[in-house]
UniProtKB/Swiss-Prot annotation:
InterPro entries: AceGlu_kinase-like_sf (IPR036393), Asp/Glu/Uridylate_kinase (IPR001048), Uridylate_kinase (IPR011817), Uridylate_kinase_bac (IPR015963). ATP binds at K18, L19, S20, G21, G61, R65, T168, Y174, D177. The gene is pyrH. GO terms for molecular function: ATP binding; UMP kinase activity. The lineage of its organism: Bacteria, Pseudomonadati, Pseudomonadota, Gammaproteobacteria, Pseudomonadales. GO terms for biological process: 'de novo' CTP biosynthetic process; UDP biosynthetic process. CDD domains: AAK_UMPK-PyrH-Ec (cd04254). GO terms for cellular component: cytosol. Signal peptide: none annotated. It is an enzyme of class 2 (transferase). The keyword Kinase applies. Catalyzes the reversible phosphorylation of UMP to UDP. This is Uridylate kinase. Keywords: ATP-binding, Cytoplasm, Kinase, Nucleotide-binding, Pyrimidine biosynthesis, Transferase. Homohexamer.
Amino acid sequence: MAQQGSGYQARYKRILLKLSGEALMGSEEFGIDPKVLDRMALEVGQLVGIGVQVGLVIGGGNLFRGAALSAAGMDRVTGDHMGMLATVMNALAMRDALERANITAIVMSAISMLGVTDHYDRRKAMRHLSAKEVVIFAAGTGNPFFTTDSAACLRAIEIDADVVLKATKVDGVYTADPFKDPNAEKFDHLTYDEVLDRKLGVMDLTAICLCRDHKMPLRVFNMNKPGALLNIVHGGAEGTLIEEAQQ
């Protein structure tokens, strides 16, 4: 059930939450961990309970990785289409978890899947969000050669979100992979150009440039930290904030 907030005023009215497909695996090596789904549904429900409008984009890497097949000769476009279908599967699983928690949710796919999902329509998505329904955007942009990170930034701009929240396994952006380099240092704040100049692997170039060109703030945080998502929405300084340079 969408839980009521603790009285704090939410900093953001509408957010776009980007989850990687790998995040749904939990401790598994493949697929979807139901416990992770339920926990994420609970955290999203907390946001809905304090009046925050939530759009979701989920990757598909827990179900399909096209890189190995592409290296073996598979056509890139075919691989990307398979990846889009994986994101739809994750979106349906998340919708089910939300509905079991009594949170109204809808899946809107960029590729037509009549009888399975709604087709993406910006105006309808905005109406669902305004009605406090969670909208899960599936199938990326509907085009090959674009990542789900790019899709998340594109949808955030289209629905006029206040911020893109990218959930990862680490608590922000580092100078290097903190799992591999113990001396890696965390950034609390970056500009889009600093991310591009330093070649930091936050998102792909297209996604970062989309955010920069449309002045869409981006925060990278650790979804595995309990309460981190709610803290961000209340204005907390979790993870790393990426935005335009202050004048």
